[in-house]
Each structure stands twice: as structure tokens, then as C-alpha cells.
């Protein structure tokens, strides 16, 4: 059921892509080693994906734990909200064929924001997303997390890259990511 794969450190996108490429299953749930999921999460998410073939992503309510414990207040999902911010965390469930369709996680997103870029690539066609109304994801907050270390210069670089790569998407939703990067995420 589980395989241990050892690869040279090439960033989270490279590791996820390698693992997903080798995965034999139909459904994917990326899970970082320090996070946790509820025991019913996979069952609930896969049930929804099976029942609705047009559904692309299933995620859930979440809470943060570690340096502080609290409910993670995620904005409601809409395609226009996705253009401004990421409200879907890394451990949402989707079909492997959709990962293949978009070419996986972008390995250029080494410094961060890879999940937001991935969800834009996957969902920019306006596809369906469903949120399970129970806490099934537990995100560990650490003092030295990569996202906390992301400085303004790196953020600008990532946002500029995304604004070019997904220009059609951001234009359609009237978002200039490169100018408003401090309001995003």
C-alpha cells in the first residue's frame, strides 16, 4: 500500500511529481510528513469524486496545530477567489488523470506557492470543487516553515512567474498579481 521512495532533494514539486508518477491509484492526496488527516477523509473525498465525475477537487475544513492551535479560516472557494488567494491546501484529493493532464506540479515553484499555482492550473477552466464540512486536515505550524521564510523579493518573483504563466486566467478575473502581491496569500 505504501512505498518508500528516496530521491535527491529537488524541491517539494519534484518529490510530489515523482511520487504521483509512481502511484498506481486513481486518486491522489499529497500529504506532507508533518501534517495529519482524519481517518474518514479519504473515504469521504473519494465517495464524492466517484459520485460526481465532473468534480475535480475535494477538500475539507482544517485546523492548525503546533506553535499555535486554531481553526484554519479558509475563504469560500470560487474561481474568482482562487485568482486572488489560495483557499485549498496541499492535501486536497483529486484524480491522477487530472494531474497528468496539466503536467503535474510546476518544478519552477521551488521557493513556495506551489499549491496555489497547481490549483490554478488544474481549475482555471472553472471546474467543480467541493468542500467537506468537517475538519479532516490538520496542518502543522512550525516556527521555521518555508512559507514564513518567503521574503518579498521571492514572493514578487513567484507572482511575476505565475502572472505570465496564467496570464489568461488572471486577466479574465481582473487580478494583477504582480502589483498586488502583498494582498495575495
Predicted region positions:
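Conserved donor NDP-sugar-binding/catalytic core segment of glycosyltransferases
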Residues: 40-72
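Short aromatic/hydrophobic "clamp" motif used to bind/position activated sugar donors
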Residues: 28
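Acidic donor-binding segment of Leloir-type glycosyltransferases
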Residues: 1-6
Amino acid at each position: 500500500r505504501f512505498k518508500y521512495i528516496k530521491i535527491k532533494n529537488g524541491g517539494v514539486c519534484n518529490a510530489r511529481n515523482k511520487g504521483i508518477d509512481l502511484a498506481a491509484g486513481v486518486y491522489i492526496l499529497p500529504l506532507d510528513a508533518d501534517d495529519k488527516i482524519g481517518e474518514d477523509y479519504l473515504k469521504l473525498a473519494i465517495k464524492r469524486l466517484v459520485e460526481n465525475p465532473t468534480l475535480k477537487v475535494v477538500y475539507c475544513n482544517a485546523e492548525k496545530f503546533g506553535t499555535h492551535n486554531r481553526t484554519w479560516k479558509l475563504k469560500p472557494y470560487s474561481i474568482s477567489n482562487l485568482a486572488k488567494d489560495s483557499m485549498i491546501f496541499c492535501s486536497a484529493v483529486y484524480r491522477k488523470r487530472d494531474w497528468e493532464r496539466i503536467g503535474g506540479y510546476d518544478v519552477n515553484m521551488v521557493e513556495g506557492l506551489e499549491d496555489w499555482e497547481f490549483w490554478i492550473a488544474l481549475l482555471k477552466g472553472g471546474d467543480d470543487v467541493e468542500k467537506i464540512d468537517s475538519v479532516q486536515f490538520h496542518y502543522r505550524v512550525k516556527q521555521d516553515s518555508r512559507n514564513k521564510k518567503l521574503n518579498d523579493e521571492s514572493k514578487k518573483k513567484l507572482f511575476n512567474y505565475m502572472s505570465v504563466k496564467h496570464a489568461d486566467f488572471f486577466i479574465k478575473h481582473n487580478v494583477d498579481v504582480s502589483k498586488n502581491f502583498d494582498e495575495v496569500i
